[in-house]
Amino acid sequence: MASGGGGCSASERLPPPFPGLEPESEGAAGGSEPEAGDSDTEGEDIFTGAAVVSKHQSPKRATSLLPINNGSKENGIHEEQDQEPQDLFADATVELSLDSTQNNQKKMPAKTLISLPPQEATNSSKPQPTYEELEEEEQEDQFDLTVGITDPEKIGDGMNAYVAYKVTTQTSLPLFRSKQFAVKRRFSDFLGLYEKLSEKHSQNGFIVPPPPEKSLIGMTKVKVGKEDSSSAEFLEKRRAALERYIQRIVNHPTMLQDPDVREFLEKEELPRAVGTQTLSGAGLPKMFNKATDAVSKMTIKMNESDIWFEEKLQEVECEEQRLRKLHAVVETLVNHRKELALNTAQFAKSLAMLGSSEDNTALSRALSQLAEVEEKIEQLHQEQANNDFFLLAELLSDYIRLLAIVRAAFDQRMKTWQRWQDAQATLQKKREAEARLLWANKPDKLQQAKDEILEWESRVTQYERDFERISTVVRKEVIRFEKEKSKDFKNHVIKYLETLLYSQQQLAKYWEAFLPEAKAIS
């Protein structure tokens, strides 16, 4: 159509004058104002002329047109369109030149037409921050909330007995009714809390910290056996594990706001948790569902569009394997340290017996004092074995379970993606069925087919949004998990090294004190 403009070149066609310009610019533009007939029949040439003129204008001049154009849009269209119809086209020329998507047929470089306002240009050119940058900009989650678990108490006799723990909470958060309160909870209550949180949040991609594992042997000893050192050791291990578990729960901003968490911490009596036993009627279907999920996960082959998720999943799987190997070695270390403590105690007793039967007074005194030193060293070995377990072995055990939950979050994202893909496949089948109905000329079933297509189109859109949402949540949760893991490992390793240093210092102190006695033997 541009070639039918009466042989007029594009450089000679200028847009109509803008109201409010300087006198000299009005005079320059008025000399080449196009006729009304040209504007009505060949409106596309107006855009071409506007594009060429904009190339000859300076950026400063182009920017100054914007506020005037806004005034023209308000006044020229609504108040003066009867008197000056050319202003309508002039306004349309500037408006359409801003939108490059409407003039794709002309292939005009939109950036050369007119410059954006400073604020809009800044916003459009500013790169979007990554998730890592957003996490670093945010302040660390600091909740004035401390939960302690103390006083494990056996209630009842025989196999019906159970252990209740005192859960004490100290906080200044307005979410809770008071600053300090305490309740009694049994182990099944902790498991029930995890079941509730997992049911609500895991399907959305959140990493719900897992509770400590069950121990049928340890609990049976506590229920049936007498109170001995092994039962006390088991209860202390479980108490510490439950305390770490509940502290991780309240440190998570999403979990902290959950009403089930507040109810667990505040309410005096909770309804009995059902289905938490492995061999219960409600526990068997859960085992079956887990096996079914494992099989279905093996059959899903996801075409990963984001390399970040693929790399992170590989990192998580490799880290879990390495932690399992390290945990096995640390458990061996703990057992060897306990054996060393027992052997040191036996050695101390033998030295004491030898010293009591020795005739040489100086030698007898030296042997007796050496036996005392060995008893102190046996105590150091026992304390260090406990430190090996609580500071190192339990840390590794916790993160092995946590990494399994992280993998479950990736699996949940994969299941959401698969649901989206299945919906797309179903939608395609519905459309093919509609095409067959059209081909067979069956109008009675056509409306139902169209309704089903609309329904599945809505589902596909919703499932796509669900996938995008869970991808965002999983990414943020993994980044948060890695930060928490780094802090956790740093704190525990520092404490562990401090215990090793203290143990070595005490050993040196004991031997330095004993050395004069050994030299005094005559």
From Swiss-Prot:
Domain PX: 143-272
Pfam families, A to Z: PX, Sorting_nexin, Vps5
Domain BAR, first and last residues per copy: 302-522
Biased composition (Acidic residues): 35-45, 132-142
InterPro entries registered for this protein in UniProt: AH/BAR_dom_sf (IPR027267), PX_dom (IPR001683), PX_dom_sf (IPR036871), PX_SNX1 (IPR034901), SNX1_BAR (IPR028660), Sorting_nexin_N (IPR005329), Vps5_C (IPR015404)
Residues with the Phosphoserine modification: S32, S39, S58, S72, S188, S280
Segments of this protein annotated with the region Disordered: 1-142
GO biological process entries: early endosome to Golgi transport; intracellular protein transport; lamellipodium morphogenesis; receptor internalization; retrograde transport, endosome to Golgi
Main location: membrane
Domains (record comment): The BAR domain is able to sense membrane curvature upon dimerization. Membrane remodeling seems to implicate insertion of a N-terminal amphipathic helix (AH) in the membrane.
Family membership noted in the UniProt record: Belongs to the sorting nexin family.
Further facts: Binds phosphatidylinositol 3-phosphate (PtdIns-(3)P) and phosphatidylinositol 3,5-bisphosphate (PtdIns-(3,5)P2) in liposome-based assays. Can bind PtdIns(3,4,5)P3 in protein:lipid overlay assays, but not in liposome-based assays.
Complex formation: Predominantly forms heterodimers with BAR domain-containing sorting nexins SNX5, SNX6 and SNX32; can self-associate to form homodimers. The heterodimers are proposed to self-assemble into helical arrays on the membrane to stabilize and expand local membrane curvature underlying endosomal tubule formation.
Protein name (database record): Sorting nexin-1
